[in-house]
From Swiss-Prot:
Function: Allows the formation of correctly charged Asn-tRNA(Asn) or Gln-tRNA(Gln) through the transamidation of misacylated Asp-tRNA(Asn) or Glu-tRNA(Gln) in organisms which lack either or both of asparaginyl-tRNA or glutaminyl-tRNA synthetases. The reaction takes place in the presence of glutamine and ATP through an activated phospho-Asp-tRNA(Asn) or phospho-Glu-tRNA(Gln).
HAMAP family: GatC
The keyword Mitochondrion appears for this protein: no
Gene giving rise to this polypeptide: gatC
Signal peptide span: none
Self-association state and partner proteins as the record states: Heterotrimer of A, B and C subunits.
GO biological process, one term: translation
Catalyzed reaction equations: L-glutamyl-tRNA(Gln) + L-glutamine + ATP + H2O = L-glutaminyl-tRNA(Gln) + L-glutamate + ADP + phosphate + H(+); L-aspartyl-tRNA(Asn) + L-glutamine + ATP + H2O = L-asparaginyl-tRNA(Asn) + L-glutamate + ADP + phosphate + 2 H(+)
Species of provenance: Prochlorococcus marinus (strain MIT 9215)
Designated name of the protein: Aspartyl/glutamyl-tRNA(Asn/Gln) amidotransferase subunit C
Length: 97
């Protein structure tokens, strides 16, 4: 891997529409070089016996059966709203027909 130079930082900044002063260019070049050094270290790690994965931890979906439950405090909840009509909250219209 090649080293990051100031011209490459300027080019990336231009593509990203960033205006960087000389101090920022130098700082970003140094930071990017440190990142690339870290990547170079990672490239040296032997991963031949490591199984491929997309996550660090296993993701398990937990499914449950949907069950209808009666709720006996509907009236109490409707009283908390600013406006209601029958057994529904009444809200301002936001879309035209």
């Amino acid at each position: 891997m090649s080293r990051i130079n100031k011209e490459e930082v300027k080019k990336v900044a231009q593509l990203a529409r960033l205006e960087l002063n000389i101090n920022e260019i130098n700082n970003h070049a140094e930071q990017l070089e440190k990142i690339l050094d870290y990547i170079r270290q990672l490239e040296k790690i032997d991963t031949d016996n490591v199984p491929c994965t997309t996550r660090a931890i296993e993701v398990i979906n937990v499914f449950r059966k949907d069950e209808k439950k009666n709720y006996d405090r509907t009236e109490e909840l409707l009283e908390l709203g600013p406006s209601r009509e029958d057994k529904y909250f009444k809200v301002p219209k936001i879309m035209n027909e």
